[in-house]
Amino acid sequence: MGIARILSAVLFLSVLFVVTFPTLLSADHHDGRTDTCRLPSDRGRCKASFERWYFNGTTCTKFVYGGYGGNDNRFPTEKACMKRCAKA
C-alpha cells in the first residue's frame, strides 16, 4: 500500500470522525428523551396566555405560555409533547 493511499485513508477517517463526533455528543440520552424534555417549564417573558404543554419528567402537563421567550420544552399539543418526550 502506497503512502498516498495511507494518507487518503487517514484523511477519510479524520473527516468521518469530525463529522460524526458532534452528532454523538448531542444524541439523545440512553432513555430516549432529548435534552429539551429535561428543561423546566418556562412561561416566557410576556403576558399573553397561550395554552401549551411541557414534559415534567414523567408526563406532559399543561401550562400557560406568555408568548415570547421561554425554552424549547414547550409544545402546542399534548400529543406533540408525548411524541417527542415520552419514553418509547
UniProtKB/Swiss-Prot annotation:
The keyword Cell cycle does not apply. InterPro entries: Kunitz_BPTI, Kunitz_BPTI_sf. Transmembrane segments: none annotated. PROSITE patterns: BPTI_KUNITZ_2. GO terms for biological process: envenomation resulting in negative regulation of voltage-gated potassium channel activity in another organism. Disulfide bonds join C37-C85, C60-C81. Residues 28-33 form a propeptide. The record marks K47, A48 as: Reactive bond for trypsin. This is Kunitz-type U15-theraphotoxin-Hhn1r. It comes from Cyriopagopus hainanus. The lineage of its organism: Eukaryota, Metazoa, Ecdysozoa, Arthropoda, Chelicerata.
